[in-house]
Amino acid sequence: MRQVHTTFPCGDILLEGVWHFPLVTEPSPAVIVCHPHPLYGGSMSSSTVLAICQTLARYSITAFRFNFRGVGKSGGEYGGGIDEQEDVKAALDLITLTSGIDRERIGLAGYSFGAGVGVPVAVRDERVSLLAMVSPALLDSGWQQLKECSKPKFMISGSHDFIIPPQQLEQYVRDTPELREFEVISGANHFWQGYEDEVADKVARFFANGFSLTEPG
């Protein structure tokens, strides 16, 4: 895996991000990974976000994580989850303009707040073909958008998540079309400490299957 730091524009501000390129010669699928809530310490340095990106690269998928506006070295300030949707669109623009990316196979993974911000973009943007949600923090409008979206989806939660309990998610799961899998990891909480590799592998397998890739040896 090759890791590359970069900056990219979103309107009149610059955002920082990190590529995780797999060691492949042909164009690879790509997944944007959106981090949890910045007002509660969330950033692209989240151990769960990092584990997902590293595992995606092991599955021959390019991963891209970035800091939302106002986080780390990204310009701007917190936008209440609305302006951050523009950050996701800017990351998609960057991916589609980057050589070595298979533009027909682009996915998005959102963790908590990252899912709440990423879902409204992913369900509408034709460039995104697969969507994974980790402990998703969605508003009712986000669940409604998911209900109307036919793209393949994956959702995962921890049995000890008391912020967004899996029982709360189950009421939405039944109404979400093309939800390929809803997993609940026993013992894990909202922050996934000690379970990062497990959740990362589940997410990466979903994208690998959706992109018709073989598992790493």
Predicted regions and their residues:
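Alpha/beta-hydrolase fold nucleophile elbow
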Residues: 100-111
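Alpha/beta-hydrolase active-site loop
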Residues: 79-99
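Short, surface-exposed "cap/lid" segments of acyl-processing enzymes
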Residues: 24-65
